[in-house]
């Protein structure tokens, strides 16, 4: 959720007039606390369910005994820095650090920072510019298509709701019953993420329909919009049909439901934290 390339950050940035970096820095404390709540609860449940111990280690080693294990020796620091270059540029350019003499050039957008990172990658890896250009635009195209597909679907859904008058009725209700906003903005996307296994569509639909009216409802665009986005991501984490849950369950060779038994309690507490303290 704190990635400069997040579609949610870009959407809220456009609504609020802030840069993407400023949007991410605004919600970062709540994001990290929600993550910490989930991690602590997951650790406690691991102890309760006894998901640790020598028997688990021996079982894993027995399964991997016949597998070929490649040991990676040494780390190329220049390679490791490549993904961080755009992020560091955006963080410096989006904060007061850009006013330091010599750092004024860091004030730029996400595409420019990504291009600088790509050029750095070409230099340190000494790979063919043709190959890295193909991979760069291939990755950019796939990401753009996936994000744009969700945004179009959410926009069509919201347009349908607006045509029926449902959005206007909901906004009017929320203006008169302001206390329901915090729960609708968090529990709604959370439940949709839980049910569908994808929190992005629900959060984008909410942010398209409701977040533009955030000031009328007594909230900032950043807090209301990013609370919905984070809640949707939390709901996805607690969903047994989410892609990441299915993959992790396959790696652990357990049922996705067993995974959710351990992730859902922490996610529920995290979304309650967002509702009570972020909004």
UniProtKB/Swiss-Prot annotation:
A molecular-function term among this protein's GO annotations: C4-dicarboxylate transmembrane transporter activity
Segments forming a coiled coil: none
Gene Ontology biological-process entries: C4-dicarboxylate transport
Record-level GO cellular component terms: plasma membrane
Localisation per UniProt entry: Cell membrane
Membrane topology, as annotated: Multi-pass membrane protein
Similarity-based family: Belongs to the DcuC/DcuD transporter (TC 2.A.61) family.
Protein name (Swiss-Prot/TrEMBL): Putative uncharacterized transporter HI_0585
Organism the protein comes from: Haemophilus influenzae (strain ATCC 51907 / DSM 11121 / KW20 / Rd)
């Amino acid at each position: 959720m704190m990635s400069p390339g997040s579609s949610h950050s870009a959407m809220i940035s456009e609504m609020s007039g802030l840069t993407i970096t400023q949007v991410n820095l605004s919600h970062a404390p709540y994001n990290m606390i929600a993550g910490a709540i989930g991690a602590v609860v997951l650790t406690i449940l691991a102890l309760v369910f006894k998901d640790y111990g020598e028997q688990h280690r021996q079982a894993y080693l027995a399964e991997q005994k016949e597998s070929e294990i490649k040991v990676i020796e040494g780390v190329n620091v220049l390679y490791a820095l490549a993904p961080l270059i755009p992020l560091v540029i955006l963080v410096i350019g989006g904060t007061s650090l850009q006013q330091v003499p010599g750092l004024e050039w860091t004030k730029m957008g996400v595409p420019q920072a990504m291009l600088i990172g790509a050029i750095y990658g070409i230099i340190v890896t000494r790979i063919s510019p043709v190959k890295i250009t193909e991979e760069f635009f291939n990755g950019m195209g796939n990401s753009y298509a996936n994000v744009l597909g969700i945004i179009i679907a959410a926009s069509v859904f919201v347009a349908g709701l607006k045509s029926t008058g449902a959005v206007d009725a909901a906004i009017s209700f929320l203006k008169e019953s302001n206390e329901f906003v915090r729960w609708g903005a968090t529990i709604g996307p959370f439940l949709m993420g839980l049910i569908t296994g994808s929190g992005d569509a629900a959060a984008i639909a909410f942010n398209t329909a409701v977040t533009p009216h955030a000031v009328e409802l007594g909230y900032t665009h950043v807090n209301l919009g990013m609370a919905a986005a984070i809640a949707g991501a939390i709901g996805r984490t607690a969903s047994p049909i989410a892609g990441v849950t299915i993959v992790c369950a396959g790696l652990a060779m357990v049922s996705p439901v067993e995974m959710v038994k351990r992730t859902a309690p922490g996610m529920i507490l995290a979304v309650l934290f967002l509702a009570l303290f972020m909004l």
